[in-house]
Swiss-Prot record:
Gene that specifies this protein: cpeA
One Gene Ontology cellular component annotation held by this UniProt entry: phycobilisome
Family annotation (InterPro entries): Globin-like_sf, Phycobilisome_asu/bsu, Phycobilisome_asu/bsu_sf
Family (UniProt): Belongs to the phycobiliprotein family.
UniProt KW rRNA-binding keyword: no
UniProt-recorded name of the protein: C-phycoerythrin alpha chain
Organism: Pseudanabaena tenuis (strain PCC 7409)
Length: 164
């Protein structure tokens, strides 16, 4: 799994050199932000069911046609799968907060997702809406410290951009 530390070391190793000062500063910055990332990961873990449910509801509110017969959210099974996928993305964001990099999102959430959704005839816009809702819902200091919210939002933006 990729983290800032493994990415920096791998890049330096591939170039046949020791990590540079700027490489080490990047690692140091990541370590300094670790407390904020862990705060965000803990809050998300404690509230993931509520956040996922609200995000799912926001997506369906914006795209009500998905509940029509034959659409991607027309049966209870499809609804459960959509809600599951949203929660899965949030869980991957939580894992990414813990490791301090996008590795979990890249490896388990983004790789091949467009092709899978396209082959199944599933629109990605509702997922984008759900993650956007989760991003816009967060508030500092009500929910998280400013730095924790910044770390959380950065990963949500990353996931949103990958689905867009």
């Amino acid at each position: 799994m990729k983290s800032v530390v493994t990415t920096v070391i791998s890049a330096a190793d591939a170039a046949g050199r020791f990590p540079s000062t700027s490489d080490l500063e990047s690692v140091q910055g990541s370590i300094q932000r670790a407390a904020a990332r862990l705060e965000a990961a803990e809050k998300l873990a404690n509230n993931i069911d509520a956040v996922a449910k609200e995000a799912y509801n926001a997506a369906i509110k914006k795209y009500p046609y998905l509940n029509n017969a034959g659409e991607a959210n027309s049966t209870d099974t499809f609804k459960a799968k959509c809600a599951r996928d949203i929660k899965h993305y949030l869980r991957l964001i939580q894992y990414s907060l813990v490791v301090g990099g996008t590795g979990p999102l890249d490896e388990w959430g983004i790789a091949g997702q467009r092709e899978v959704y396209r082959s199944l005839g599933l629109p990605t816009a509702p997922y984008v809406e759900a993650l956007s809702y989760a991003r816009n819902r967060g508030c500092s200091p009500r929910d998280l410290s400013p730095q924790a919210l910044t770390e959380y939002n950065a990963l949500l933006d990353y996931a949103i951009n990958s689905l867009s």
